[in-house]
Amino acid sequence: IYLAVLLLILGVIGTAMFIVYQSENIGKQVAGIFEGIEEVQPEQESGSAEAEQSEKTHSVKGTGERKVTILSCEVLPDGTQFALKGEADAFPESDDNNLYLLAMKTYEDAVPEDAVPIARAEKKTSFMLKADILDNTADSRLYSKFVVAVKKDGKYEVLSTPQYITNPEALASYSEPYPKAESIKGLLVDPQKLGTSELDDLGVKQAAYNIPIARLLGPSTHSDYPTIIYNYNGKDYTLNGHVVSEYDYVFKTLSDKGIVITAILLNNKSDAYPQVIHPLSRGGNAYYYAFNAAEEAGTDYLEAVAAFLAERYRDEEHGIVMNWIIGNEVNVRSTWNYMKYVDIDTYAREYARAVRLFYNGIKSFNANARIYISLDQQWNRNLSSDSSYDSRDLMDAFNECIKEEGNIQWGLAHHPYSYPMTWPKFWELTGEAGEMVQESEDTSMVTI
C-alpha cells in the first residue's frame, strides 16, 4: 500500500488539497480512519442507458451463473504473449472438447457473431489459453478484454466474464522506481513563474499540472513548433507541437528540481474532436466531460493520447511524470465529468472503461507510474444523482467494475476540502459542520 499526502493548491479546478491513496484492493479507505470495503459482488446489469445489443452478438452480460472462473490474465515474461488462466468444475456439452478464447474491444459489451478465436485449449478443470499481444499494431490486444467460450451448434457460448490484461507494466521499457519525494508540500504550478525562485523558496517537492486532452489534438498553433505526427496502433494522429512544447517546459523544469509530478487528464470540449466526448455527454454544458471509451473512434484517440504522454514524459529530456489522475471530482457528474443522468452503476462502468484504458496505456510505457481516480469530499451525504453521487457509493461501484474484469492497482486522489469551504480552521468544527465531519466510515464529509 502506498500512501502519500499531496497538498496541492489547485485553483484552476477548484481543489485546495487532495490525499492520494493507492492500494491493490482498496482494503482501507481515505485518511486512515475507515475500516474497509465489503467484498464486491458481480456487476449488476443496468437499464436505461444501455444500448440495445445487435442480434448478431453473443451477450456477456446477464448470462446467469458463470461456468468458468478466471484466475489471471497477464503478459508472459517474453513480452509478446499473454496467458489467461482459469478453472471450472464442469463444462456444458459442446461440439468438441475445446475451450476457445475470444477477444472484445474496450467499447464492446458483446462478442461479435463473426468473432474468430485467438486461442484454444482442451477442456480441463484447470486450463491456460495463450495468444499474441501484438502491441502497437493495428491488431493490438493491449486494450482488449477476453472471454472463454465453447462451441455449441456451431456458435460460441460464452462461459466467463470479460477479463483485461492486468500487468501492462510488463511491456514497459522504462521501469525506474517510483521516486521518494523530499516533502509533501506541493502546488498546482503556474508555468509563467517556473523561471523564478518561488518553488525553491517555498520548498515545493510535489507539483500538479492540468492536461485538457483536446488541447493536444490538431495541427500546431505556432510556426516555431512543428505539428507532431504520432503513429500508434497503425494510425497517425496529429498533435499540437506548440502545446506539447508547453508541457515539455513544465515537466522538464520540475523534474530537474527533483519535484514529483502529477498530471491531471481532463476532457475538455472541442468542436474539432467530438469523438473524445462520451456519447451520453454530448450536448451538455460543463467544465469537463466524460471520456469516450464507449465507441471505437473515442477509444482510438484516448489510447493514442495515453501512449504519447506516457512515452514522452518518462525521461530526462522531456521530464518524468509518475502520477496520472483521470478526470477531476468525477462524482460531481453535472460539473466536472459531465454525463446526462444515468444510474450509478452505468456511470461507474463507463468511467471504469476509461480508467482501464489509460491504466494499460500509461503503464505499458512507464512500469511504475501510478494511476488515480478523483473524488471530492462529499463522502456519504445521500446526494441526489441528478447532479452528484456520493464519493463512497461511486468508489464502491467503480471498484466492483474493476475487480469483476481483472483487478489492478488503481489509486484514489481525494479532495478533502474543509467544511464549510470558507472555514479555514478545519480542526475546529462545531454545529452543523461538527455533525457533517465525524471519525466514522459513515461520515457525511471527509475533510483534511
Q: What is the predicted function of each stretch?
A:
Residues Q29, I33-G36, V305-F308, E350:
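Charge-rich, solvent-exposed alpha-helical interaction surfaces
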Residues S140-R141, D200-G203, G406:
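Flexible, charged surface loops at secondary-structure boundaries
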Residues E93-S94, P219, D271-Q275, R381-L383, ...:
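Short acidic, gly/pro-rich beta-turn/loop elements at beta-sheet edges
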Residues I1-Y2, L6, G11, T15-Q192:
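Mature N-terminal, pre-catalytic/accessory segment of carbohydrate-active enzymes
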Residues V305, E317-M322, T346-I448:
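Noncatalytic carbohydrate-binding groove/subsite architecture in carbohydrate-active enzymes
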Residues K56-G64, G258, N368-R370, S374:
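Generic detector of solvent-exposed, compositionally biased contiguous segments
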Residues Q81, Y107-P112, G154-A310, G319-I325, ...:
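N-terminal substrate-binding region of glycoside hydrolase catalytic domains
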